[in-house]
């Protein structure tokens, strides 16, 4: 099972492909992981994620003690950072693997089972990943690590310096995914903006996205986790000119006051952020901007927070998430600042930001009523088929609920297809509509 972000999920999918090439039957489902081997891919980003990871490991350790599992392995960010401590505290785990040595688990499984008849032709390297997402969308991880060293962030301490994946490898992987029926590529990295600087000594994100857009069968390409400093502006031309590159950008801005941006070591000012946002909106009309904010960082005054709230109202982001500061071992903030804001104040600030965003979202969603939007369908729930527009990423954004009684027939809406949907009503984070036509 996988905890944490979509970047972790890609690692799990790669491991599953290697295991299946040896004849193992893998299930990405904790309810199925009984009787044989369990592998937990952990997150170690913030306190809540670490707690979830440890609790999950303990649950599976108990299952092993009860005889429900033969072996238990743990990999990922938590194991990368705290392996020695965890080995002593949770001896039920057979072996721990970090962020970069997890494929050594293959060596640990000395005697693989005999391949089943359906798997006899499957050889190592035949497929790069076992896709655990719905077949019509997948994640393409284009780099590891981060060089930014923001004050609050432990990711560079876990994953190391930014390392781009060679472009040709990414193109081959994306072509393979398209051949599997993937229609939506969610391009992910801790820092999309830096792609190519290490390998090619220049920004190569625009070139990469242009080449991905040429792959037959890819209907949407979505960009996640751009960094505002040293932003690769030519990507905006690609987003405007290429029909299958979504007008959607996930760019984490974190705060809005100069004092907090400096304290957070973001290497950008509010004025520079505002100019960047203006340029993005001018170059890509109608773009959906998603951002993430961090509140309760040491030194955030009430005046800082009020200015942040005013800025959120001013900028009118289409999608927004807010998180409370969590002190992480080894970070600049943990070493140099006192965690001086009470937890209840942090949570109140998160709630207030989200109340502001809820009102913004309600207005923006209401403006879609009466429009016909292109929607990719994800799943069925009762008498609705649930889908998303180009402005919505899987699992984190808004959804479109399409009226679709569960009767078979000529007008049935299929999962994993594009349709034109007439929007009839809206709620704060959801749209409701009916079939207009199949794209």
Regions found by a protein language model. Name each.
Residues 70-76, 81, 179-305, 313:
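Conserved SAM/AdoMet-binding glycine-rich loop
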Residues 133-136, 146-148, 245, 255, ...:
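Short flexible coil/turn linkers enriched for glycine and charged/polar residues
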Residues 150, 170, 187, 223, ...:
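Conserved, mostly hydrophobic/aromatic
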Residues 218, 246-248, 284, 288-290, ...:
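Active-site lining segments that contact anionic ligands and/or coordinate catalytic metals
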Residues 1-195, 234, 249, 271-282, ...:
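Proteins enriched for Cys/Gly/acidic motifs involved in redox and nucleic-acid/cofactor modification
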Residues 333-439:
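Terminal RNA-binding accessory module
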Residues 189, 225, 253-255, 291-295, ...:
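Active-site proximal loops enriched in glycine and acidic residues that flank catalytic Cys/His/Asp
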């Amino acid at each position: 099972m996988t905890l944490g972000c979509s970047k972790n999920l890609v690692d799990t999918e790669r491991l599953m492909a290697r295991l299946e090439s040896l004849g193992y039957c893998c299930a990405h489902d904790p309810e199925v992981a009984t009787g044989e081997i369990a592998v937990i891919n952990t997150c170690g980003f913030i306190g809540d994620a670490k707690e979830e990871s440890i609790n999950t490991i303990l649950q599976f350790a108990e299952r092993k003690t009860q005889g429900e599992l033969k072996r238990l392995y743990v990999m990922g960010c938590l194991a990368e950072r705290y392996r020695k401590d965890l080995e002593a505290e949770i001896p039920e785990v057979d072996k721990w693997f970090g962020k970069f040595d997890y494929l050594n688990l293959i060596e640990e499984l000395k005697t693989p089972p005999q391949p089943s008849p359906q798997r006899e032709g499957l050889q190592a390297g035949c497929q790069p990943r076992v896709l655990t997402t719905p077949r019509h969308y997948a994640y393409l991880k284009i780099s590891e690590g981060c060089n930014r060293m923001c004050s609050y962030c432990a990711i560079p301490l876990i994953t190391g310096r930014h390392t781009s994946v060679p472009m040709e490898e990414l193109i081959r992987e994306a072509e393979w995914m398209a051949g599997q029926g993937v229609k939506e590529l969610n391009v992910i990295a801790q820092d999309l903006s830096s792609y190519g600087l290490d390998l090619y000594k220049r920004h190569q994100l625009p070139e990469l996205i242009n080449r991905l857009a040429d792959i037959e069968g890819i209907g949407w390409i979505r960009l996640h986790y751009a960094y505002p400093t040293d932003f690769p502006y030519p990507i905006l031309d690609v987003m405007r000119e290429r029909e299958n590159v979504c007008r959607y950008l996930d760019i984490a801005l974190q705060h809005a006051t100069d004092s907090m941006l400096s304290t957070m070591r973001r290497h950008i000012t509010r004025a520079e952020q505002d100019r960047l946002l203006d340029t993005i909106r001018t170059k890509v009309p109608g773009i959906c901007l998603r951002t993430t904010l961090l509140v309760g960082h040491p030194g955030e005054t009430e005046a800082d927070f009020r200015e942040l709230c005013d800025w959120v109202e001013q900028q009118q982001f289409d999608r927004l998430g807010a998180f409370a500061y969590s002190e992480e071992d080894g970070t600049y903030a943990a070493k140099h600042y006192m965690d001086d804001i009470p937890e209840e104040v942090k949570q109140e600030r998160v709630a207030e930001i989200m109340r502001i965003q809820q009102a913004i979202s309600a207005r923006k969603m209401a403006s879609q009523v009466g429009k016909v939007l292109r929607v990719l369908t994800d799943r069925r729930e009762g008498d609705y088929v649930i889908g998303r527009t180009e402005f919505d990423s899987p699992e984190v954004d808004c959804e479109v609920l399409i009226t679709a009684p569960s009767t078979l027939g000529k007008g049935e809406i299929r999962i994993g297809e594009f349709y034109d949907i007439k929007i009839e009503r809206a709620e704060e984070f959801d749209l409701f509509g009916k079939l207009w036509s199949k794209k």
